[in-house]
Regions:
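N-terminal membrane-insertion alpha helix
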Residues: 2-23, 160-163, 183-184
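Alpha-helical heptad-repeat coiled-coil segments that mediate oligomerization/polymerization in large
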Residues: 121-135, 139, 143-167
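Selective recognition of signaling/oligomerization transmembrane alpha-helices
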Residues: 149-196
């Protein structure tokens, strides 16, 4: 019984670590996406203000925000990539996500450079939405993968709980049989001969 409980606890600890890592991956990727969207929004606002001939200081503030967001997104994405990938499917998904991130990040970098050099036509025709959509597809795939990991961990934990409960009940039944047998044997071999 103790061996089975130890096995279940060890298995649950491994699954808990797996769930924790999955949640960290989800958080890092979600933060990366949020910061990239923040950079994109700042660039779009700066582009609009540039087209409307607003003062350079207003535009410069937005450009600083966009550049800072792009730098922060790189740091966040590196932390995401530093987390170990499990099976071959997850490693392939990680590589695809890395490619789509690099493409989206590069498109935003180019857009910022074009805006800083006042090339509005290049800024407006940058394929940022396409690269963002590609990243979002990978982002959603990660969400599904992490949900799958969480569901599998939950199902396995439930199975371990049921096995532990079955072993515990079995041990109680075996103990009751042993005690009943011992009482019967004591009565048959010790108490009944003394009654004569």
């Amino acid at each position: 019984s103790n061996g089975m409980s130890f096995w279940a606890f060890r298995d649950d600890l491994q699954r808990l670590n797996q769930v924790e890592q999955s949640n960290q991956q989800r958080a890092a990727l979600a933060q990366t996406r949020a910061v990239m969207l923040q950079a994109s929004t700042a660039l779009n606002k700066a582009g609009t203000l540039t087209a409307l001939s607003y003062p350079a200081d207003d535009i410069k503030t937005l450009m600083t925000t966009a550049r800072a967001s792009l730098t922060q997104s790189t740091t966040l994405f590196k932390s995401f990539m530093a987390m170990t990938a499990g099976n071959e499917h997850v490693r392939a998904l990680q590589k695809e996500t890395e490619k789509s991130f690099a493409r989206w990040h590069n498109d935003l970098e180019h857009q910022a450079t074009w805006l800083e050099s006042n090339q509005l036509s290049d800024f407006l025709t940058a394929p940022v939405q396409e690269s963002q959509n590609a990243f979002d597809v990978n982002f959603e795939a990660w969400q599904l993968e992490i949900n799958h990991v969480l569901e599998a961990a939950s199902a396995q934990s439930q199975r371990n709980y049921q096995i532990s409960a079955l072993v515990f009940i079995s041990m109680i039944i075996v103990a009751a049989i042993y005690i009943s047998s011992a009482l019967w044997w004591t009565r048959k071999m010790i108490v009944q001969p003394l009654a004569i």
